[in-house]
């Protein structure tokens, strides 16, 4: 009996600590600061820009009997409200538009991944790095 009471007390204390902090144990989907590499085919430089992207956890479920039932749609942390900013890459030859746009997350949500606007995961062919020499400093429009 004493062992059961001790176990119950330990469980209540551990849950109380999580409730008292009022912070989720895992960060939910929200905008975070990130650095992106920006380059364009035909331009000889790469620039890094600071922006906000969506990151964090979204609740998901998996079926126990996957062979019998169709899979449940999985949600990801994605943009709710987004604006695009543009920069001008220096040194682009004539005939190449030097303007490149990148997303700035204003708010995020958990929802289906849209390949048209998001990286939906999976293996990458190459890391997200610059192919051209990196230039410091930004030329915002």
UniProtKB/Swiss-Prot annotation:
Gene3D superfamilies: Cystine-knot cytokines (2.10.90.10)
UniProt-listed GO biological process terms: G protein-coupled receptor signaling pathway
UniProt xrefs under SMART domains: GHB
Chief site of localization: secreted
Function, as annotated: Promotes spermatogenesis and ovulation by stimulating the testes and ovaries to synthesize steroids.
Subunit annotation: Heterodimer of a common alpha chain and a unique beta chain which confers biological specificity to thyrotropin, lutropin, follitropin and gonadotropin.
Protein name (Swiss-Prot/TrEMBL): Lutropin subunit beta
Organism: Pan troglodytes
Gene: LHB
